[in-house]
């Protein structure tokens, strides 16, 4: 047996034994893995910045975050569209583009992926942490390392300013994302979509990260914050700013995503001619997958699950959605 045949036999065995039939569960698995990749790269870049005394280097952080998002979108883009962000998923559900059941399941997967990625980075840099802080975990200060995992606001930032910061940044994020996935707009081709999203994150970080790090993603902030609490950083991970900060990246991001979705629909989406408002503005990628899966079951199509990504792109022309 040749090597190539051996590989095919191994892949066929793996598919037979472990392929998941539920499209929803497949989506959750993809979101989990993609967010894990996103957070490992994002937190890894933050760790490198802190250990090399580049804590305030916005360009370093911005390009690291942008490239992390690009890689993560490539991971799950063909399966779910790569939401990667509970706030984005909620916004798409509000617009009727993602079933609420899928939204909630994806959110759980995203938080789990972010938490386990935080554990992975802690293990990866455990020795470096001990050298840097002498084994005494600190949240803030010269030897503080909690910013590897979560965002913390500048001392001058008020609670009101922090909330506006998160709403404004996430609204801009979703406005541009919706423009990229709108069939009637100048959306990038699927293969270039992750690059475009990465560039969006770069410019958002450069322009808006000074106040509080531009979290713009609840799973990117809350799950790692929970991890740092468990890992020995103490209650200061939540008590910073008198307990007026830790919930802002969660609530503000969700609010901002919904605001941004409404703004895009008002100024762009609702302005297309009525003839152009076809199913591209009302159907989600996952709902299309589910319809195809049901049809395949009725027709007893044995090979339906072998290449759902290619079927998704060629038959439906839908691009990935993010983030």
Curated annotation (Swiss-Prot):
GO CC terms, sorted: basolateral plasma membrane; plasma membrane
Membrane protein topology class: Multi-pass membrane protein
Keyword Transmembrane: yes
Pfam family, one: MIP
InterPro entries: Aquaporin-like, MIP, MIP/Aquaporin
Transmembrane parts of this sequence: 32-54, 74-96, 103-123, 161-181, 193-213, 243-263
UniProt KW keywords: Cell membrane, Glycoprotein, Membrane, Repeat, Stress response, Transmembrane, Transmembrane helix, Transport
Functional description taken from the UniProt entry: Aquaglyceroporin that may modulate the water content and osmolytes during anhydrobiosis.
Protein name: Aquaporin-2
